[in-house]
């Protein structure tokens, strides 16, 4: 309930002076005025109501017994003023009640909150209230002081309750403490909190909190009484409470003499007098605050009623806050449950998706392995037939064999890309780091793409800004080589005839930078975000003009990420593109390896450099690869013996001119095998080739990468045996 903006005990003449000031102000503003005399209300407490367009004011005066003073209060809350008018309406003659209705109608448009008084009116009131009055009423000073002390005590208790409301949202604890403190302050025998509940259209209530003076006072906690709805409250009383009015009964036996049921109830629970104030939460009667006097009838003082009313208002705030907190906690629990359910559903969906993804990748990997073996044989046999020494091929035969060879090679490259991508996505890709020459790496990559550049009539250049002292890099040679080959191949593919592709390399502090720049068709800005996604071609028109499965750049990105590097693209449509790769340098844990000559002639060369003669021993456990190698070397005129283990004595007993050791090396320690062979044979007597990734094996003459490309493989073997043939001469 709104509190007065002014509440003091004043001499009667000062009240009259305040009323005179208000009447003058109302007359000047054309405001409506209603006084006790106009409605002839049967009350000895004078009042004055002023209602203007922008504010309303109620001046109340309650006589102080045995003193010529009033307790003067000023309220500016329209709702409180309307409640006051409805309260006195029953005491006003019927012919005067239209005056009250008229004032109530004028109050309706005003806001329910306190209105700001006009400045001149506030100044006039302050001038009156500021005058010295104590000299004219010295006899009432002790009573005034006592009243002020009581008021201060009430305000302290209100402050304590308000503080507790702010500090705690636990309603049971708050109400339990509040009823104890209020009972002690009012000095009553029993203080109760009752709560209403609407069930199946019937109003029911129950005492939920209680504080008794001592154990002799019987407890009414949880009591329900059918007499007069609840605890002696008839429907009219319930309506009064709902409107915010208090029920004040000094002597129950006398007041409810005509209600035996209620008299019996009061006698049973030793109730002589009660004071009931409503607890209204959000304009709904939530419950009541009840004070019982059990030893005697009690004349309840206006300040006691007012104090209990103020406390009920603070409790209303606490109850509303607790309800909001409870609803919030319930909503929080509901949301948490929904989040947990949604999270679990997402986990299950993610798990199912990951399982499907793994199955797909496993299937791709399995099928790629199964397809790669026969394709390797097809490529090898077609390459062997192209060099068939027993008779010349017709033009048509050669054309068909070249189609078979090129188509098989293209399909094998696609399958290898799918296999590499599947392994990368499954997290199975591992780097096989070794030390290598950056310049030699670039030379090897340019040599691989040189035939493609020649076919497309594209000028292929390089700019290597690598000082000799920093020509060494520690990384996966095959992966980095494939990164550069993919970028160079794409650049050549999308560069028109007479265009240019440049490979650059330089150090930027501790980062090795590779850059491939072309003068090709460029990439539209809105499509550049798709570059590194698998199975992506930038436009359907590109797919018709340029072949490819859209895996090269996706694999490139995976391999760059494996090296903890980065890749960037800068492209302008119609002018060309620049791809830049940065690879961080890491420490080389191994000593410098020997530097064999790695220059490789163009792959288009098919000329045999020496006359094939002598025996070559192949050590391999892979039947398909071994069959292909034997076919290639036998067709070229070599005698080939295939072993599945690397027993040294058996190898040397065959007196080979070269030993090919193929990955995987499950047949023993390769370095130990090479050392034993080198102890018995010099490089001029025996060549040792590793078929697989480049490593740091001491005593090895040449590394030939897998899978086998027949033309390149034969060139590598022939070149490796050149020095042997020269020394034999």
From Swiss-Prot:
Disulfide bonds: none annotated. Its EC number is 2.7.13.3. It is an enzyme of class 2 (transferase). Residues 613-729 are annotated as: PsR domain, binds KaiB. Keywords: ATP-binding, Biological rhythms, Cell cycle, Cell division, Kinase, Nucleotide-binding, Phosphoprotein, Transferase, Two-component regulatory system. Residues 1-169 are annotated as: N-terminal domain. Signal peptide: none annotated. The modification Phosphohistidine is found at residue 369. The keyword Nucleotide-binding applies. GO terms for molecular function: ATP binding; phosphorelay sensor kinase activity. SUPFAM superfamilies: ATPase domain of HSP90 chaperone/DNA topoisomerase II/histidine kinase, CheY-like, GAF domain-like, Homodimeric domain of signal transducing histidine kinase. Functions in an input pathway to the Kai circadian clock. Senses oxidized quinones via its C-terminal pseudo-receiver domain, providing a link between cell metabolism and the clock. Affects the ratio of phosphorylated to unphosphorylated KaiC, binds quinones via its pseudo-receptor domain. Quinone-binding destabilizes the protein rapidly. Autophosphorylates, does not transfer the phosphate to its pseudo-receiver (PsR) domain. May play a role in cell division. In the N-terminal section; belongs to the phytochrome family. The N-terminal domain is followed by a GAF (phytochrome-like) domain that lacks the conserved Cys residue for ligand binding, a histidine kinase domain and a C-terminal response regulator domain without the conserved Asp residue that is phosphorylated (pseudo-receiver domain, PsR). This is Circadian input-output histidine kinase CikA. It comes from Thermosynechococcus vestitus (strain NIES-2133 / IAM M-273 / BP-1).
